[in-house]
Amino acid sequence: MKELKRDLLTTKYTKVLVEENYQFNAPHRYEVVTNEPGCYPDTLAKIHFQEGPIKECGVNGVCNEDLINMVIDRLEHFQQSEFACRENAIAITKLEEALLWLRKRTIAREQRGVEGTHSV
């Protein structure tokens, strides 16, 4: 595992680790660990994404949409509290937009008869 580096990813409290060796064009395993100076990192979460097409490999991990929906749910709960804010509302909208584009991709693959397979 190596540390994930992204422009907007903060490492103030946690670090995200990503597998280095993977198949099917993208990493499948991620970990979120504590990032406290002088302390050994504790694993807070392990995420295992789907490895390979479902029709060929079966369901063996979470999909992108699962995690996006979790974040939307969490932000919607904040929006029902004293922590409601414009930034959360915009983030929800953008995450919902991401779900729309991912759904559009799936629909297009279904129409071509290749959804759930390794075919393009």
Regions found by a protein language model. Name each.
Residues 1-36:
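Short, charged/polar N-terminal "headpieces" of proteins
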